[in-house]
């Protein structure tokens, strides 16, 4: 049966550039990959055709020869012949990302995005731990004890994965490189060795405790130092306290994500604190004093001058939060709220009415001026 046109196979025009070729190939390769269509001979055949078409057209020299002579350019043995199975057979579906799309995922033919390196050494995974602290703890700082479930190096086999007294052996399939080449038409593709999964070694007699993994799960207790002045959303990194690496690989890191609980009285903005304090109408009018307990446990006196208005702020210098890793302190801002009296007695009502009758514009300049300006605006 005559071969299909390579451009038609990929669904692109004969003027398609490299970007268009790659985009079309990725879409079709994902659709027809044998691992997504197990047992489907037609999908496997289609996948091989797509592979062959792309490998030809992405190479400028091969593409030029194909454009001039068609399939005849490669019919005399040319650059190789199809090998048994070839392509990605035997590999997991993730191989398509590792072998074809490696450059997109930070990998490449010397390793992959999962941290595996030549010889099978693999970095352990990073871990995340969420911790909630109070504003007082953020103010003073603290040392917290936490328990984290993680994977640690197996003590029985020292991380080798092999039963004590035995050793892993060099993989016979890839000769220890962790990579193999598979023929596909007139080209070859390098991919992860399916026998050793890229480790370069195989274990014939695995460790009984870790079952050949080289690490076991355990809950560890760690001490975390939280400095004073720490802010909500801060991330603390504990290097090497993540999961143990595989086959001698380095451990991952543990990241502590801190959140500071809302406080009943104080709101925080950077190193400054804000607190709303309600005072009586008479205190606002006549003046007075009140005490505020700050986060450090001390009391600070606030003097309210006569005629204080709602929203007035008083600054208590140095009574805010510590500035992280500094000797400086933020400030505490007291914002005044004036409470209107409720459930008045008859006598209280009479006195307020009398006060209102004898009040002048000078007593309420803002409200008097506001209504005068409004009247002038609308009536002209």
UniProtKB/Swiss-Prot annotation:
Pfam families: DnaJ, DnaJ_C, DnaJ_CXXCXGXG. One of its GO terms (biological process) is chaperone cofactor-dependent protein refolding. The keyword Cytoplasm applies. Its cofactor is Zn(2+). Residues 5-70 form the J domain. Zn(2+) 2 binds at residues 171, 174, 193, 196. CXXCXGXG motif repeats lie at residues 154-161, 171-178, 193-200, 207-214. Participates actively in the response to hyperosmotic and heat shock by preventing the aggregation of stress-denatured proteins and by disaggregating proteins, also in an autonomous, DnaK-independent fashion. Unfolded proteins bind initially to DnaJ; upon interaction with the DnaJ-bound protein, DnaK hydrolyzes its bound ATP, resulting in the formation of a stable complex. GrpE releases ADP from DnaK; ATP binding to DnaK triggers the release of the substrate protein, thus completing the reaction cycle. Homodimer. The J domain is necessary and sufficient to stimulate DnaK ATPase activity. Zinc center 1 plays an important role in the autonomous, DnaK-independent chaperone activity of DnaJ. Zinc center 2 is essential for interaction with DnaK and for DnaJ activity. This is Chaperone protein DnaJ. It comes from Allorhizobium ampelinum (strain ATCC BAA-846 / DSM 112012 / S4).
